[in-house]
Amino acid sequence: MKAGKSERERSSRRRHRSGDALATVVVKQERLSPEPVAHRRPDAPAASPPPPAAESGSAGHRGSRARGASRSPAKKKSKSSGRRSKSPRTKRSRSPHYSTVKVKQEREDHPRRGREDRQHRELSEQEHRRARNSERDRHRGHARQRRSSDERPVSGQGRDRDSQILQAQEEERDFNNARRREHRQQNESAGAEAQEVIPRPAGNKNKEVPVKEKPSFELSGALLEDTNTFRGVVIKYSEPPEARIPKKRWRLYPFKNDEVLPVMYIHRQSAYLLGRHRRIADIPIDHPSCSKQHAVFQYRLVEYTRADGTVGRRVKPYIIDLGSGNGTFLNNKRIEPQRYYELKEKDVLKFGFSSREYVLLHESSDTSELDRKEDEDEEEEEEMVSDSS
């Protein structure tokens, strides 16, 4: 009897496990709630040992019913579940309940769902940003097209107007370049040589363009100052480009109060420096009122107009004051500093407060007056010698 009972329990457990496994598979695939298991009420009497022999009829009836139940797994399942109701809640079934499976699935799906939501949100933000950028670019393109269409003139009139604007710009540029070039040439030549001009084309008769300036390789600035040093002293004056050595033999006749001093020949150089600094001066002036570099006697090649109207060139003497303290006097008139003054035959020069006078003459000049003065001086000297004897 006990062996049959244990056998029935084992078979019912097997069926219960297979039924639970089947129910679990159905839950995972179809996600349906399992059929409710019929539990016996807690007040139901527990399984009692088999009745005595007096109730053998009813026991036999029950045994036949149990046999019938073994054929139908559903009834056996309810019996076995009822029999197992005594066990703790955690040991009722070894297979997980549907709610537990659902919780596990939700935990597994949660990170995937969060990742998908995040990706979807990022994609939507990127699409929104892209759409906004494309809309901004489209607005900019429309504005640019509108601006270009506003600036773009009508085809025929636009071409004419563009050509006129270009022509006017070229003319203005050429005119400005010509003015700058002319101004630069005037500054360099210091108004020495007249510049030849070339008339512009027939369209611009009122504007003239000077001859193209040739490059100048002469020293200037600090280099010129370094090269303009003589015997360790920096010379204040630099000769102009038109400086020339004269062919005519000019001379300076100095006088001190009526006394004739030795003649100075000044035709061997293009310039002569006059001053108190004997180390660098070509013509020293020892009077204390004179500056170390007082003035310069300069020969320049300049243009002049002949009697027949033609233009010629000639070397003429000039005097320039180097900004001396007490000035330079030409025919008893003080001249302006840093400015050339043309000298002529028989002009008289004085420097500072010195009493010496310098008369400018050349080899062809009439020196009869000077000879007469020299003769008078010699006669006076002879008379003085005879009186003393």
Swiss-Prot record:
Family matches, as SUPFAM superfamilies: SMAD/FHA domain
Coiled-coil residue windows: 166-197
Keyword Phosphoprotein: yes
Compartments, record wording: Nucleus
Chain intervals for the UniProt region annotation (Disordered): 1-212, 363-389
Bias (Acidic residues) ranges: 374-389
GO terms of molecular function: mRNA binding; transcription regulator inhibitor activity
PROSITE patterns assigned to the protein according to its UniProt record, in alphabetical order: FHA_DOMAIN (PS50006)
Record-linked Pfam families: FHA (PF00498)
UniProt biased composition (Basic residues): 73-95
Keywords of this entry: Coiled coil, Isopeptide bond, mRNA processing, mRNA splicing, Nucleus, Phosphoprotein, RNA-mediated gene silencing, Spliceosome, Ubl conjugation
Numbered residues of crosslink Glycyl lysine isopeptide (Lys-Gly) (interchain with G-Cter in SUMO1): K28
Record has Transcription regulation as a keyword: no
Biased composition (Low complexity): 54-72
Basic and acidic residues bias locations: 1-10, 28-43, 103-138, 147-163, 363-373
Main location as per UniProt: nucleus
Single GO cellular component term: nucleus
Covalent crosslink: Glycyl lysine isopeptide (Lys-Gly) (interchain with G-Cter in SUMO): K28
Domain of life: Eukaryota
GO term, biological process aspect, one: negative regulation of canonical NF-kappaB signal transduction
Crosslink position(s): Glycyl lysine isopeptide (Lys-Gly) (interchain with G-Cter in SUMO2): K28, K104, K214
FHA domain boundaries: 272-335
Functional summary from the UniProt entry: Required for pre-mRNA splicing as component of the spliceosome. As a component of the minor spliceosome, involved in the splicing of U12-type introns in pre-mRNAs. Down-regulates NF-kappa-B signaling by competing with RELA for CREBBP/EP300 binding. Involved in the microRNA (miRNA) biogenesis. May be involved in cyclin-D1/CCND1 mRNA stability through the SNARP complex which associates with both the 3'end of the CCND1 gene and its mRNA.
Assembly notes: Component of activated spliceosome complexes. Component of the minor spliceosome, which splices U12-type introns. Binds SMAD4 and CREBBP/EP300. Binds the SMAD1/OAZ1/PSMB4 complex. Interacts with DROSHA and SMARCA4. Component of the SNARP complex which consists at least of SNIP1, SNW1, THRAP3, BCLAF1 and PNN.
Official protein name in the record: Smad nuclear interacting protein 1
The gene coding this protein: Snip1
